[in-house]
Amino acid sequence: MHLQLIKDNIHSVVICYT
């Protein structure tokens, strides 16, 4: 259900973490 939101959040974290 909120997988899309979590994926988007993780993507943002990964980009910021990189």
Swiss-Prot record:
Induction remarks: Identified when cells are grown in rich medium (at protein level).
Protein name from the UniProt record: Protein YtcB
